[in-house]
Structure formats: structure tokens, C-alpha cells
């Protein structure tokens, strides 16, 4: 669910910026190397290559199922990405040295842990996994060298959203940075990108995976000019889960500094989604499959549920019961019912479609909320307009007036149709298919098919 949440959040922002006339490059993808992938493939009785092909195909399905407007899907097993990761290594070579190392490795996080990061000897994010004590010769990135430069980067408000994640990152850096391992011995882990010039080592998965942010743009060759346009000259936003602050805001930024590449402008972190107050787990039987939700409720309903009823930045709890209640109350009885009522009255009583207004009432408020990554607040503004339109119908009773005073009644219906049109346009980045259906209904002066059937 976390991946689906960030895909949809990023899609809303991409659609908003495109609508404003800004060029956008929106990329998603899959990290396909590392011990976790290798062990999962073994468990499935497959070779890593076959396993990741299936894994990537499942993620690629999400583009259609969630109606994502993404421009690229980057696989870290692709030849272009492998070449980019190796070039990143070469450009960081002045900050890389080989050392012998012993440490505790969490396969779930794909990272080494210090004793102070563990709770009762286990990773707090993966308590079912016992960290593996690893002793081997690895290449290390001189992370400690970048302490002051990272603090300077983090001092800029807006470098990390929300603000308390920025404070968390600053505190981590001020606590002192330790150089970190960026390779594994090939004899222990063969599934990885080869280290340039050393056949005995493969890259640590995070060094490889983080490079996807620029490999997807065609770096280092940049034959299409996308890297220059969107990274060097554009404004770069990364969307990630709260457990990635150390990797995205510190490790990756230090790598970029070392390679003399511009740093990310903003990184937005979302919270976790729990179910019934607990982390989703097959053993607990509380896993919510987003694909099942799309099949039952439809794409736009799932987008709505994630954007309005999940906090953009804090942990949120979702249950199947709550999802059904939100769907019924806000989509079936709310938005869907309003559009059906108004357009049925218009179809029966107006001689022609209304002349739709050019502007959008409330657009500036929506943009302001989205600029602050407040997806839920933006939707609350739109749904308050839906509630207000419902109240207007109840109070003014246009269905009666149109019979007793046709001229006044038709004016009332035209005004309601204009508001339905306005609501439809405001919904465009959040619920694009629903937005299109609403606008089509107003332009044709017809009641649409049931937008959100009662389930």
C-alpha cells in the first residue's frame, strides 16, 4: 500500500504541474538487486532474473490500474541503469576506499545497523528478522567527509517535507556520520551490479538503486537532453516513505556531492499505512491488497481513499470496513449522487447544455494545498463544495421550482450544472476519469452512468 500511496501522490502533483503548463518528467520503477531480492527468488524457486521480471511486471500493471501519468518506468536491472550506476561509482571514486568490516546487516532494510539502532537485538522495522553478523572486505563511501556539507544542504527550508523529517535528518547528521559500506563480496552475494575494476565485489543495493533518479533521465550520456532539462535546470522532487530519510536525504545527497551533480531540491516523505492499528502482515491476516480494492471499488475510488483518508505525512490506519464506509458516504451518497441528481434534472428540463464557465472557482485554494503536499485538505475543500451544493438543492428545491416557475427553475439548474462542472474540473488531478465523465455529462446535458455504484 505504501508504494501505491506514493505513486498516486506523485501523480497528482505531476498532473497539477502539467495543467499549469510546466514540463514534467514523472518516473517510477523497481529496485531489483540485493540480498532481499536474491533470497525471495530462492524462496520462490526461481532464478533472480525470472523473479524480477515477474516482480517488475506486477509493478508496471499499477500504471494502468491506478491511471498513472508517468513518463518512465526504470528497472535497475536494465543495461542503461547498470552503466549509469557504474559511472556513478567512478565519479565517486575519490571518496571510496576498501576496508575490512564486521557489522549487523538487516536484510529487510538492506542496510547495516548499529547496536543502538536495534531494539532487543532486532531492527524495529523488521522485528521478525534477526540481523546477520557479516564480516567481509568491502568498499566504503567516505560519508563522514560530508557532514558539514549535508548540514548546509539541510538548512534550507523545503529541502525535506514535512519539517519534522528535516529536523530528524539534521539531528542524525549532528550525531556524527560513519562511513558506510557500498559493496558486498560476490562470493557471498552474486546478485548485484559488478563494481568497476573489481570482479570480486558487487554494489550495495542502495548505491545502485538511488542512481535510478538520474539514470531514468538518461544520465550520463543524456542523449535526449532530459537530464539537463529536468535535473540540472529543473526543480527535482522525490517522493518516498518515512523509513528512507537516511538513504534519500543523506546518503544519496552525499553521493551527488561527491559526483559533483546538483542535489535534489525537495524530498517529500509519507507515513506508513497500518490496518487495525497494526503493521500489515500475512500472519495477522490484515493485509489490504490495493489491486483487490481497484477491482472492487474502481481506480478513482482507490485514488480518492488514499489521498483523502490517509495522512500525507503521518501514519494512518485503514481497515476494509472504513474503506467501504468512506466509499459509500462520500462517493456513492456524496459525489455520485450529486452529479446524478443535477444532471437528471438538467436532462429533463433544459433545452440544451449550459455554456460552461471558463475559470475554476476554488482552484487557487487547491493549488495552495497541493504546494504544501496537503492532498487530504485539497480534497476536503472540493468535497465541502459537494456538500454545499447538496444543501442548496435541499433548501431551494429546484425540482419543484422548475415546474412552478420554469424560467427561474432553469436558471437554478444551470447554476447547479455550472457548479458540477466546476467540481469536475477541480477533481482532475485527483480522480481524472471521474473528472472527465462529469465534464462530459455537463457538455452533453445528460445524466452519466452511475459513477460509484452502491456495493
Q: Which role does the model predict for each range below?
A:
Residues 1-28, 80-87, 122-348, 354, ...:
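Structured secondary-structure scaffolds
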Residues 1-95:
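N-terminal Rossmann-like or analogous alpha/beta NTP/dinucleotide-binding catalytic cores
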Residues 93-102, 111-118, 134:
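Short, flexible, mixed-charge glycine/proline-rich loop motifs
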Residues 91, 105, 112, 122, ...:
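The −1 position to Zn-ligating cysteines in a subset of zinc-ribbon hairpins
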Residues 94, 108-111, 125-129:
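Short Cys/His-rich local motifs and their 1-3 flanking residues in nucleic-acid-associated proteins
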Residues 25, 29, 46, 101-104, ...:
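Basic, alpha-helical terminal appendages of large translation-related enzymes
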Residues 344-359, 377-381, 393-403:
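Short acidic alpha-helical/loop segments enriched in Asp/Glu that coordinate divalent cations
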Residues 72-83, 98-111, 269:
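Short, glycine/charge-rich beta-strand/loop segments that flank catalytic centers
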Amino acid at each position: 500500500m505504501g508504494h501505491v500511496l506514493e505513486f498516486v501522490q506523485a501523480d497528482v502533483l505531476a498532473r497539477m504541474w502539467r495543467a499549469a503548463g510546466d514540463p514534467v518528467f514523472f518516473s517510477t520503477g523497481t529496485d531489483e538487486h540485493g540480498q532481499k531480492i536474491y533470497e525471495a527468488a530462492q524462496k520462490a524457486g526461481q532464478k533472480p532474473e525470472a523473479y524480477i521480471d515477474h516482480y517488475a511486471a506486477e509493478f508496471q500493471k499499477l500504471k494502468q490500474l491506478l491511471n498513472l501519468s508517468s513518463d518512465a518506468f526504470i528497472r535497475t536491472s536494465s543495461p542503461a541503469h547498470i552503466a549509469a550506476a557504474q559511472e556513478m561509482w567512478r565519479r565517486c571514486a575519490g571518496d571510496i576506499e576498501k576496508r575490512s568490516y564486521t557489522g549487523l546487516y538487516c536484510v529487510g532494510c538492506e542496510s547495516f545497523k548499529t547496536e543502538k539502532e536495534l531494539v532487543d537485538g532486532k531492527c524495529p522495522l523488521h522485528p521478525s528478522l534477526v540481523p546477520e553478523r557479516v564480516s567481509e572486505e568491502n568498499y566504503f563511501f567516505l560519508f563522514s567527509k560530508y557532514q558539514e556539507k549535508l548540514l548546509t544542504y539541510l538548512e534550507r527550508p523545503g529541502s525535506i517535507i514535512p519539517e519534522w523529517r528535516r529536523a530528524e535528518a539534521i539531528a542524525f547528521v549532528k550525531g556524527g556520520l560513519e562511513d558506510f559500506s557500498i559493496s558486498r563480496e560476490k562470493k557471498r552475494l552474486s546478485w548485484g551490479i559488478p563494481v568497476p575494476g573489481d570482479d570480486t565485489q558487487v554494489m550495495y543495493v542502495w548505491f545502485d538503486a538511488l542512481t535510478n533518479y538520474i539514470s531514468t533521465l538518461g544520465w550520463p550520456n543524456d542523449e535526449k537532453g532530459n537530464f539537463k532539462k529536468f535535473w540540472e535546470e529543473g526543480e527535482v522532487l522525490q517522493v518516498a516513505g518515512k523509513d528512507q530519510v537516511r538513504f534519500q536525504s543523506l546518503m544519496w545527497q552525499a553521493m551527488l556531492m561527491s559526483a559533483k551533480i546538483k542535489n535534489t531540491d525537495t524530498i517529500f516523505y509519507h507515513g506508513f499505512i497500518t490496518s487495525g492499528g497494526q503493521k500489515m502482515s500475512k500472519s495477522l491476516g490484515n493485509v489490504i491488497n490495493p489491486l483487490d480494492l481497484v477491482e472492487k471499488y474502481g481506480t478513482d475510488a482507490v485514488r480518492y481513499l488514499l489521498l483523502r483518508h490517509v495522512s500525507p505525512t503521518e501514519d494512518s490506519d485503514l481497515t476494509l470496513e472504513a474503506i467501504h464506509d468512506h466509499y459509500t458516504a462520500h462517493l456513492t451518497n456524496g459525489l455520485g449522487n450529486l452529479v446524478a441528481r443535477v444532471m437528471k434534472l438538467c436532462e429533463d428540463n433544459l433545452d440544451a447544455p449550459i455554456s460552461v464557465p471558463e475559470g475554476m472557482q476554488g482552484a487557487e485554494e487547491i493549488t495552495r494545498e497541493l504546494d504544501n503536499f496537503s492532498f487530504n485538505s485539497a480534497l476536503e475543500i472540493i468535497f465541502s463544495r459537494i456538500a454545499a451544493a447538496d444543501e442548496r438543492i435541499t433548501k431551494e428545491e429546484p425540482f419543484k421550482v422548475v415546474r412552478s416557475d420554469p424560467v427561474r427553475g432553469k436558471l437554478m439548474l444551470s447554476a447547479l450544472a455550472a457548479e458540477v462542472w466546476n467540481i469536475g474540473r477541480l477533481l482532475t488531478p485527483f480522480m481524472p476519469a471521474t473528472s472527465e465523465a462529469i465534464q462530459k455529462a455537463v457538455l452533453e446535458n445528460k445524466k452519466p452512468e452511475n459513477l460509484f455504484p452502491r456495493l
